[in-house]
């Protein structure tokens, strides 16, 4: 489906990984076995992420007032949803873009890309988990605002700087294609705007008390 979307947007096959642009190889006796274990571990970590967030919430909840604790309890659900959305975004959008670009990039025709299995999986895991963490921005903003360390005014002042940083980052990790850059940067900008709304709502609620 993503391949069809990619072609519909005029991006070619940048979201497709039908045929790897490089050959994978194993250069260690136990490389495939340890890679299998690593994939199993991180898969388990992703699946159990709602429970991990719940345990984190149980650890920090005593620091909240009763009314605040009830209000923030839904944060466990939203943290889990945002994290899983980030993982999926990283796996289905960022990974194909990055792997296709990096796998076919050459400084010279004399150098061929033969990527080790461990390097490939490590890159994939890093991309997915990095996106999962980035998608936690609204939750982070919520807690920073509650602690008085962040205000919507500050976020609005640095909005342009943040958008520029997002565009630069998306240009680095994607091929030199404007459609790919928009596809990567748009969800991150939406997250930033959502975080501003969350921060403003918390400030209004605090002012009413």
What residue spans do the PLM features occupy?
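Membrane topogenic/interface segments and analogous intrinsically disordered interaction regions
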Residues: 1-209
